[in-house]
């Protein structure tokens, strides 16, 4: 279990050591939980609820011994500790007791990335039609080109052999006001 201590200052208190901020990994979902404990509560057992999975854990802090810089923390999970992923009962003989295990980087749960959707048939048609109208008449304002493209869309039936196409021979030319070439 990775535990990290970081003293912080809250906005409501003036002393720089008003509370300690601890980073604790949830034993169920491995989410890093930031727990701020006021100094007056340092000897109490604090209940921590994971915001991701709802697991309740109890965080117990002990005061530092003389010569010790960091606090020792004990975290007991309230149910579900038997369901840890990758837990094993055997200890590794290759690790030496002189060297503490290297801390792994914190595990951060990120929201899933939004998938880029393909443009609709209307959006593709309008983009191509405005581009075609502006290439035929570069001085036309975008507003008029959009209006002409919208009128052409009203006459366009997708996936129809007789519909107008951006490169076809049935295209309404010019500004698209119903004039056929």
From Swiss-Prot:
GO terms for cellular component: nucleus. Residues 80-122 are annotated as: Disordered. Disruption phenotype: The double mutants crc-1 rbl-1, crc-1 sqn-4, and crc-1 ult1-4 exhibit strong floral meristem (FM) indeterminacy with reiterations of extra floral whorls in the center of the flower. Restricted to flowers, mostly in carpels and nectaries. Expressed at low levels in sepal primordia (buds), sepal receptacle and developing petal. Not detected in placental tissues, septum, stigma and ovules. Changing residue 129 to K: In crc-7; abnormal gynoecium and lack of nectaries. Induction: Down-regulated by SPT and by A class genes AP2 and LUG in the outer whorl. In the third whorl, B class genes AP3 and PI, and the C class gene AG act redundantly with each other and in combination with SEP1, SEP2, SEP3, SHP1 and SHP2 to activate CRC in nectaries and carpels. LFY enhances its expression. One of its GO terms (molecular function) is zinc ion binding. It is found in: Nucleus. Keywords: Developmental protein, Differentiation, DNA-binding, Flowering, Metal-binding, Nucleus, Transcription, Transcription regulation, Zinc, Zinc-finger. CDD domains: HMG-box_SF. Residues 87-99 have a biased composition (Low complexity). InterPro entries: HMG_box_dom_sf (IPR036910), YABBY (IPR006780), YABBY_C (IPR056775), YABBY_N (IPR056776). Residues 100-109 have a biased composition (Pro residues). GO terms for biological process: carpel development; cell differentiation; floral meristem determinacy; nectary development; polarity specification of adaxial/abaxial axis; regulation of DNA-templated transcription; style development. PANTHER family: PROTEIN CRABS CLAW, PROTEIN YABBY 6-RELATED. Belongs to the YABBY family. Transcription factor required for the initiation of nectary development. Also involved in suppressing early radial growth of the gynoecium, in promoting its later elongation and in fusion of its carpels by regulating both cell division and expansion. Establishes the polar differentiation in the carpels by specifying abaxial cell fate in the ovary wall. Regulates both cell division and expansion. This is Protein CRABS CLAW.
